Amino acid sequence: MLEVIKLKHNTPEWLEFRNGRIGASDAAAVLGRSNWKSNQELWEEKIGLRKHVEFPEDERIGYGAAVEELNLKLFAVQYADKYKVKTNKTVVYVKDGFQFASLDGELEDIKTGELGIYEGKEVWVDSSLVWEKWKNKIPDQYYCQVLHQLLTTGRKFVVLNPTFRWIDRDGEIATKTRRITIRLSDAGIMEDIKYLDEAEHEFQEYVKRKERPPRLLPPL
């Protein structure tokens, strides 16, 4: 069951709400595909044994939060002929009572009327491995996140908007932005969403029973 509730993001009430529930940023850890925490560490967070940690790179996360609204406004200007863009930081999408998502932006395709999702990302490029992870694909951490957003909102597509940032040879900050659209109708997406949904329900049963799940290791 899908529902929409009013809850201002990042308030004490919102932080309390997410306790024991699975958000988009948790999805990769549920599957053992997170770069930052294991499924067992996530379980410890959900039952209160460990303090919730979003990501360890606090300074970079702070930068991303600072430019998030600017990037969304730029996207809205650049795609004004294609999408209606809005942001609502008082809406949380909930599925089955425990799966939830709060969105960076909400999209409406002007031509078709389809509803979609805007998801912004700031990616710090500190080695060639970062480019390799994004070469013709989406890293697992972010792919799982957008699958979860599609799952919990019932929307038809996501536009992932990663902005890559690095220091160039002159010591100046350089940036490059990509736009990646993922649709429910794309090959394999519905199957991947079903797999994630089943895994999240299984994980939630471990949370409810306070039984530690088997440890899942990320693929090499």
Predicted regions and their residues:
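Accessory terminal regions of nucleic-acid processing enzymes
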Residues: 1-220
